[in-house]
Every structure is written in C-alpha cells, then in structure tokens.
Amino acid sequence: MSQLTDSFGRSFAYLRLSLTEACNFRCSYCLPDGYQADGRPRFLQVEEIGRLVRAFAALGMSKIRLTGGEPSLRRDLDEIIATVATVPGIRKVAITTNGTLLPRRLPGWHRAGLTALNVSMDSLQRERFKTITGHDRLPEIQQGLALAQALGLPTIKLNAVLLRGLNDDELPQWMDYLRDRPFSVRFIELMRTGDNEAYFQRHHLRADVVIEQLLAAGWHERPRAADAGPAREFGHPDHRGSIGIIAPYSRDFCKGCNRLRVTAKGDLRLCLFGEFGVPLRPLLQRDEDHDALLARITTQLGLKAAGHGLHQGQTGLTPHLASIGG
C-alpha cells in the first residue's frame, strides 16, 4: 500500500516518468513546429532512473508509466524498462508512445518487462492522422498494435485527443473498430497549455458531447474501481473493446488523483499544471542519498493543491504536453 498520501486524503501509487522532451511528431495541438532543443538536453540516465524508481517503490508505488516527449527515441529504452521492471514492488511497467517504432522495438521492450502499452492515435483515417500529427505513419502504428496483441500484452490502450472540426465525427468508426479488438480507447479533452490558447479556442470540444453519443448508442458506464485513474469507462455487450473519457474540465476531475510526475530532467511535479517543480536530481547521484530522497518526496506532497487551475486559465509551468508527457 502506498505511503504517499496528501493532505486531502489522496493516495499515490502511480508515477509518470518522462524520459525525454524530444519528439519525432509535429502534432498540431502540442508541437506544431516540431521539437526545438533548448541547448544540449541532459535527461535522466539509467542509473538515476533506477535510484528514483527504487525510492518511489519504497514509498509504496507499484506502477510506473514511461512517457516523453517520445520515449522510444531513447536508444537505451530496453535497459530503462528492465531497470524499472526489476525494482522490488513494481508490478506494472507501462509506456505511452506514438507507436511509430513498435514494429521494430516492441519485442525488445516486452522481453525487458513491459506490461502495458498506450499508443497515441488521434484518428483512424490516414489523411486526417497525417494532418494532425504531421506524419503519414498510421499503417506502421496499426502494424505495431497487431504485434502487441500477438505478443500477449495484457493491457493495450489508445489515446485520441478530441479536436473539434478535425476528428470529432469519428465516434461511429471507433465503435466499429472496437467490436472485435480488446483495446481501450481514451478520448481526451484538449487541454489548454502555455502556448496553445488560440488553438484551444478553435478546437476544444467538451467530452459531454461524446458521452451523450455513447449512451444513445447503447454503451453503459462501468463502475469505477477505487484505484482507477481519471477516465470514465464505457462498455457495450457487443464490443470487445471499451471507451474511456478523460475530461479535465469536468467537475471533481482532480478528486481521485492518484499520480505524480517526474520530468525528464528530474523535477517532481505534483500536478500536470502545477506552478513549480521540485528538483530530485541532486539526490539521484549516490545510493547513500536514498533516505534524503524519500524525505524530499514525502515532504513535498503536503504542498499538492486540491485541483488544477484550468478553469481560471492557469496552465502552470507546462508550455506544451511534450515537456512533461501528459
């Protein structure tokens, strides 16, 4: 059981760890001009990641999600996964990726200990996918998903950002896609960040619109588990797959928060849209600093706010989602 509990009684057993800020896509809602390196980046190394994960595991965390940027750009990703997977107490190692390198690299990740896969796939239509992401790579991603099924990965999820006027008419196609595929598709409300205000105003779509369509089509909301994340899950008796709705602008979205974040440069972020980061990297250089690292993490939890400030237009330190991995 997690020892990480904040002043609002929320318990944290899930860490989202960014491995890089770099990305090979140019998604219109995130990095439309592509990744621009700020000097020579120095992201967390394998040894530092090992010390970090051991600390969180000692505090009761059991799930680690590797994010980016695009984590598959790390050449040492197999080693990172193996390092994380062998930490005592870690039961689930997941990755969120754009999926372009799955056909080539997924078998190695699986052997290293990967147990769950999330793939960003904002459209089922090839031309639309190219328009949104800046790359015509949907066939490779579909190939990678088939490989994930063949390897027997127990959890496969797809993430699609809801974009008004770009992909908001695809729900019937997604329903058909899930009829024979045991995937969970997550529709995510577009979130305002530091550099996308105009884009947000043009393309934000409330998730309620999708929920109404799901209910009208005979889908039913499933009971939420006590340790579930923010998604509202919907199922249908005639479909193998499920649909999740992640609506950060909905009431009580932050009430069940169960995750913390660490950036690719080693800063603890208590909230995706928090106003500050807590540097952990100085305590990741020696095994002897383990106890000091535990103390820094637990002390900072007392500063976690009840909720984000998105409704007030507050986006915190997040210039775009590639900087912290969502």
Annotate the PLM regions:
Residues 7-47, 272:
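Canonical Radical SAM [4Fe-4S] cluster-binding loop centered on the CxxxCxxC motif
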Residues 35-39, 103, 125-132, 194-198, ...:
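A short acidic, helix-capping loop that chelates divalent metal ions and anchors anionic groups
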Residues 43-65, 73-188:
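Radical SAM/AdoMet-radical enzyme domain recognition
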Residues 19, 66, 185, 266:
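Residue-level signature of catalytic and energy-coupling elements of molecular machines
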Residues 25, 126-127, 252, 278:
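Glycine-centered loop/turn positions within well-structured domains
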Residues 70:
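Conserved G/P- and acidic residue-centered "switch" motifs that form tight phosphate/ATP-binding loops
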Residues 1-14, 176-180, 190-326:
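Auxiliary Fe-S-binding modules of radical SAM enzymes
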